[in-house]
Amino acid sequence: TTQKRESAFDFWCRLAFEEGINFWFEEEQLFYSDEHMGMTAGIHLTYNPQADTDISDSTVMTWQYGEYLCVDETIHKDNNFVRPSYPLSHENKIEQGGQHSVFESYGRFQLDDEGRPLTQVRFEQLRNGSKVGQATTNCFALMPGKIFTLSQHPHQPMNDRWQVISVSHHGVQPLADNSGGEGTQLSNSVSFIPGTQEWRPPYRYKPTADGDEVATVVGPPGEEIYVNEYGAVKVHFHWDRRGSADHSASCWVRVAMGWSGNGYGFSAVPRIGTQVLVSYLNGDIDRPIITGCTYDGRNAPPIKFPENKTQTTFRSQTHKGEGFNELRFEDAGGKQEVFLHAQKDMNTRVLHDRTTHVLHDHVEVIENNQQMQVKGARTETIDKDNSETVGQHKKITVGKTLSINVGEVIELRCGASVLRMDNGGHVTINGQEFKFEATGPVQITGKDVDIN
């Protein structure tokens, strides 16, 4: 619970009145009560409109009492982000009520156990004025927190127990030389309600937030990221003079993302030391939510400004280590670029087709090994030249057929040995030594066969 723009007394009163607790003083003692049964009874007053004929100190001279049209139903509704579909709503009403209801859509509770008593107290607060009266007496024992009994009123229902709500005392003591024989006069004005009715101090709405403010994300010593299962973080407000700038500085504060859904969306957790902008739901100072981050003297942007003002970047930082991952866009005229940096591994998963179309050059450098597996067929088309250089060994394994179709000439060369074939049907083998071995017959067929 946050105290804002209110004195310590007003802050205490707001919390007490929210629970329906009233208080009063008797001599040097402070009394609290949340029901009329905790109040002191035993004061007996007599109704006598002829005050001049009564010399006692327990007389009621004037009496007014009325019952008024008032709120007969209260409905309070709220929302718990942990159970967003749960109908977190409570109501209270008198018998046959519902014609004059008060509905508050922001009930200031997150659980049913909080909502039920809060709604009951608010209902009783709104009905404080349903049965109320005023009287003039000369009894100075009356004070808030007291219950008195009236007798000898001509209207019998008035001869009952009544609860004092407020008292204003008046006294006149003439100067001795000018008294004319008049004595000291004492009286008071009393506001009261039926003795069995629960009177609740008026509800005090908490001060609303003035707007957004800046805070710093904090956490336990030695941590860089401190977050709960909902992506919420702890923050230290700059106006906090007493709290430590660690994981005890605040409640868990949720972070608003640019896009969110059930298992999808954008997620980026503000890290410890990040300066964030904090907003408040419905202006409630006890319901902060982080709506953005900002750079400051401790946290510099990932790119240098204004030199790189045309760049848009998304850069992370290695947790408890060096390096980063980055996706960057350069929009300078003639230098447009999309840059992707992976600090370690990069995994791409495409569940259907993938198409890449490069309108100019494509350069790829792999400084270690490459492995490719094609479970179906593979087709490669090169409109012009194809040059392949293998520094050491190359091995081709074909399960069935290997077909090589060349339009003009094919030549295999290994040192001084050459095998050349052209599209005219000429096959030439050059070498220093020829060795033919066969485990079966060898057959040479031709129009002319010359062997030298």
Task: Name each region found by the language model.
Residues 1-195:
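Extended, domain-scale alpha-helical bundle/helix-rich regions
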Residues 1-5, 62-69, 128, 135-138, ...:
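Hydrophobic alpha-helical scaffolding
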Residues 25, 31-33, 210-430, 434-437:
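Structural signature for extended repeat/solenoid scaffolds and their inter-repeat hinge/linker regions
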Residues 126-133, 150, 197-202, 218, ...:
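Glycine- and acidic
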Residues 195-212:
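Short boundary/loop segments of OB/S1/cold-shock single-stranded nucleic-acid-binding domains
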Residues 428, 432, 439, 445-447, ...:
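Long, distal/terminal scaffolding or interaction modules
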